[in-house]
Amino acid sequence: MTKLKDITGKALSGEWGTDDETGVGIPVLRTTNFTNEGIVNYENVVTRIITKKDISEKYLQSGDIIIEKSGGSDKQPVGRVIYFDGPENTYLFNNFTGLLRVRDKNEWFPRYVFYSLFANYKKGGTRPFENKTTGLHNLKTDDYVSRYEITEIPLNKQVAICAQLDQILKVINLRRKEISNLDDLIKPDLSRCLVIRKLIQRDGLKSRFQKN
């Protein structure tokens, strides 16, 4: 077992800057761009004016893992992770999130590290590291990164496992989309059925009164 801190180092803090009134700011990913499937949602990405000079290492690279530091709720713990595979040197991440970047990709496959964190979150592994304040759930990020451990296996096995998991997730997401599309088809029919039912009930009552 290897500690996450030895794989990625401490989580880098995000940037927020100031309002972009000119439309030429830097796109910044927020927790609203997180999905529960670990995929980045690029809808409604905000742009911000960030003037710090030492942010070059914070531009997102392929294989970066973004972890949620603040957010969540009583039903949804803080600590979600998303895997970044978008265009490099384009996006930053905000101050409610942190960046985990694998140091040695010859030893650790970033996708494997992501899946380990993703699975740990799904089983509630971040809850012991929550610090609740008024209306907010904060992740004790440094503590979590220092104590969380990942099973060390050869790189080729890491890649093979991730290929299998990617395929499984692809099938799951496809099924979810099919179910969602089916719901969209069924809802109008259900609405029609309810209208017809009300008409039958109304007309049935009228007929009964007319007979009496």
Per-range role (PLM):
Residues 17-24, 128-130, 202-207:
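Short coil/turn segments at secondary-structure boundaries
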Residues 1-2, 16, 90-98, 126, ...:
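A short glycine-rich beta-alpha junction/loop motif
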